[in-house]
């Protein structure tokens, strides 16, 4: 889909660049595949703010997207339509399966209404088809990749994202992610062929603060603009640079500080995403 720009008849339209969604389905989602979503506003069960600068925004309905692709394995599905989903950057596709049953899946690039998709142990290497990643040839572009067998896709799910198979060894597949990281994934984990739809999402410009508010994002205050009681960077006479290395409001280093602590899965990372930056 293309990008839309506007004549600058108002200040916000001058900078506005959005994705043209005129080809998407304009009706409501399938009721059986949706459920209500309660906005937390960044609060936890105690009502305390755990994520700052969240709240408000348009009310949303949660679409139940099939990330596992195992329930209708072996059944050929037909893409009924491509829909907008407010809960993610990618588009979703409504698939109807022979013998009955419908599901939403992440819409891959170049998949349109009327196309046929299928999942199973051995299926064609065609965008939208899902199968164990160990059965795909080296060089295949994939998305919605499982990290645990049967748990559902976890890698490469956002708009325009994909991973590439670069090797196979001893039941594991080596994937190259968009970040530059190379990672081992078990060969029985499912993945979907192709790249995720809406690659132009990276080029949008919201044009005004209010459009960010519609998405549920509140103003992000800088620490150097606060008082000393509110932030380690706060205070000082006149404008200051903060006077120290960047830290969070609680004093922990930020802006580049490594926070990964999951040593249990370090063995699956063949090449770190930080290596290419050196």
Curated annotation (Swiss-Prot):
Q: InterPro entries, from UniProt?
A: NA-bd_OB-fold, Rib_uL2_dom2, Ribosomal_uL2, Ribosomal_uL2_bac/org-type, Ribosomal_uL2_C, Ribosomal_uL2_CS, Ribosomal_uL2_dom3, Ribosomal_uL2_RNA-bd_dom
Q: Does the keyword Cytoplasm apply?
A: no
> Residues annotated as region Disordered?
223-278
Give this protein's Gene Ontology molecular function annotations: rRNA binding; structural constituent of ribosome; transferase activity
Q: What is the annotated quaternary arrangement, including any partners?
A: Part of the 50S ribosomal subunit. Forms a bridge to the 30S subunit in the 70S ribosome.
Q: Which NCBIfam families match?
A: rplB_bact (TIGR01171)
Concerning its family, UniProt says: Belongs to the universal ribosomal protein uL2 family.
Please state what the protein is called.
Large ribosomal subunit protein uL2
């Amino acid at each position: 889909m293309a990008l839309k720009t506007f004549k600058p008849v108002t200040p916000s339209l001058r900078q506005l660049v959005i994705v043209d969604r005129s080809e998407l389905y304009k009706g409501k989602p399938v009721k059986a595949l949706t459920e209500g979503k309660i906005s937390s506003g960044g609060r936890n069960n105690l009502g305390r703010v755990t994520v700052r600068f969240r709240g408000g925004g348009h009310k949303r309905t949660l679409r139940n997207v099939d990330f596992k692709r195992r329930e209708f394995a072996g059944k050929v599905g037909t893409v009924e339509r491509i829909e907008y989903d407010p809960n993610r950057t990618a588009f979703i596709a409504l698939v109807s399966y022979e013998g009955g049953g419908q599901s939403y899946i992440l819409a891959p690039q170049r998949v349109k209404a009327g196309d046929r998709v299928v999942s199973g142990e051995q299926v064609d290497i065609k965008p939208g088809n899902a199968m164990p990643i160990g059965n795909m040839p080296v060089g295949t572009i994939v998305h919605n990749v499982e990290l645990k067998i049967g748990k559902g896709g976890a890698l490469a799910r956002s708009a325009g994202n994909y991973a590439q198979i670069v090797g196979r060894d001893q039941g594991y597949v080596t994937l190259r992610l968009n970040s530059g990281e190379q990672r081992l994934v078990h060969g029985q984990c499912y993945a979907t062929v192709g790249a995720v739809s809406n690659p132009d999402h990276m080029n949008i410009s919201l044009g005004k603060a209010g459009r960010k508010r519609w998405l549920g994002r509140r103003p992000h205050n800088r620490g150097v603009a606060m008082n000393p009681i509110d932030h380690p960077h706060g205070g000082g006479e006149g404008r200051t640079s903060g006077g120290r290395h960047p830290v969070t409001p609680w004093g922990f280093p930020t802006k580049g500080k490594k926070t990964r602590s999951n040593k249990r899965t370090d063995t699956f990372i063949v090449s770190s995403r930080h290596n290419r930056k050196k």
